[in-house]
Amino acid sequence: MTAKWEKQSGSLGVLTYEAPAEAFDKAVDQAFKKVVKTLNTPGFRKGKMPRAMFNKMYGEEALYQDALDILYQDTIEGAVVESGIEPIALDNIDVETLEKGKPVEFKITFVIEPDATLGEYKGLEYTAVETDVTDEDVDAELKTMQERGAELVVKEDGAIENGDTVVFDFAGFDGENQFDGGTAENYSLVIGSGNFIPGFEEQMVGLKSGEQKDIDVTFPEEYHEASLAGKPVVFKVTIHEIKAQELPELTDEFAKEMDEEVSSLDELKTKIRTRLENTRKQEADASMRDELVEAATKNATVDLPEVMVENEVERMVQEFTQRIQSQGIDLNMYFQLTGTTEEAMRTEMKEQAEERVKARLVLKQIVADEKIEVTEEEAQAELQSMSELYNIPADQLETMLAPQGGLDTLKGDLQFRKAIDVLVDNAKAK
């Protein structure tokens, strides 16, 4: 087989190759064996119709489309490997003639990654981020620690405030009728969390245990349940219990409970300050790198195939789904709680997907133009670093990475990191 790749406009190209006559004849035989199993022929058991009778009744040409599908599946992988291309999607399959005993010429139009035309990517400017840590920052971190160690104490007489955890019943009414999914008993909600429809939690503030109230809200226009979208409804709520956070005192004992490596509150404050400084420096570095990649991407020209953007949106949806599932929330529940839809989410993700795909192509072009390489030793060193970070043996980690391309994928990530290093080394603060 001789495969020939011819680049066309944009991200399209045509792969031409010829499958030998004997391969097509074999595919026709396979197609007959597949089709005959579905035929009931008088005088023969199902699937036992003779080939000669089939050809007489239907014509051998009736097998050609199935045979072509079989031949394509048997030959396309070898042709792609021989041509050296990495197709993203199939656009069209063209075969001019099909005749038994003759070779078959395939002309396959594929979508491939487009080349990025780089603009300015050296001498870019970035916004320097302040990394100093103040006493107020340390105090805020201590307050967060207090809240993590807080106990929920029942408020016997007090009214609901923001931050309180409330246990209550609710029933949603559209006019005189209750609607599905709008009713629950002994539901627990942190007021101010924003988990309910806008306006709901705010109207609970000030209520006391045992009290009831009708809460008027309007579902968002883009709400996933079309029958409720944009509709005003009433939730009848009954408050059962209100719990407020009781914060622990800031003492040396508190400090030791929060961090067994310190012996006093002052030591804890020092450790917090050091950690915040390191975190802010890392965040500042990440912000600078993101800003430079964004600028280099903006300066470049890339004709993005729609299929690449769609694939990226699909990846983003899967990532988001896995993230919320790890928090015990499925996608349908998320849409119900936030009043949005999957279609709206995908539309919102599309612009970000375009930027992500374009940025990858720009970095890939910088890797090519700068002739950036990653050695086997560098890849192994990165694998070892990941092993220590995730506390997983390096050989086990390499096995886990194998389905995603193993060390080759790791090398690609390191090439991108080095490409960003080129941007950083040639950039300056505004």
Swiss-Prot record:
Full protein name: Trigger factor
HAMAP family on file: Trigger_factor_Tig
PROSITE patterns for the chain: FKBP_PPIASE
Gene3D superfamilies: 3.10.50.40, Trigger factor ribosome-binding domain, Trigger factor, C-terminal domain
Keyword Cell membrane: no
GO biological process: 'de novo' cotranslational protein folding; cell division; chaperone-mediated protein folding; protein transport; protein unfolding
Domain notes: Consists of 3 domains; the N-terminus binds the ribosome, the middle domain has PPIase activity, while the C-terminus has intrinsic chaperone activity on its own.
Listed SUPFAM superfamilies: FKBP-like, Triger factor/SurA peptide-binding domain-like, Trigger factor ribosome-binding domain
Main location: cytoplasm
Species per Swiss-Prot/TrEMBL record: Exiguobacterium sibiricum (strain DSM 17290 / CCUG 55495 / CIP 109462 / JCM 13490 / 255-15)
UniProt keyword annotations, A-Z: Cell cycle, Cell division, Chaperone, Cytoplasm, Isomerase, Rotamase
Pfam families: FKBP_C, Trigger_C, Trigger_N
Catalyzed chemical reaction(s): [protein]-peptidylproline (omega=180) = [protein]-peptidylproline (omega=0)
Family affiliation: Belongs to the FKBP-type PPIase family. Tig subfamily.
Annotated GO CC locations: cytoplasm
Localization (cell): Cytoplasm
Gene this protein is translated from: tig
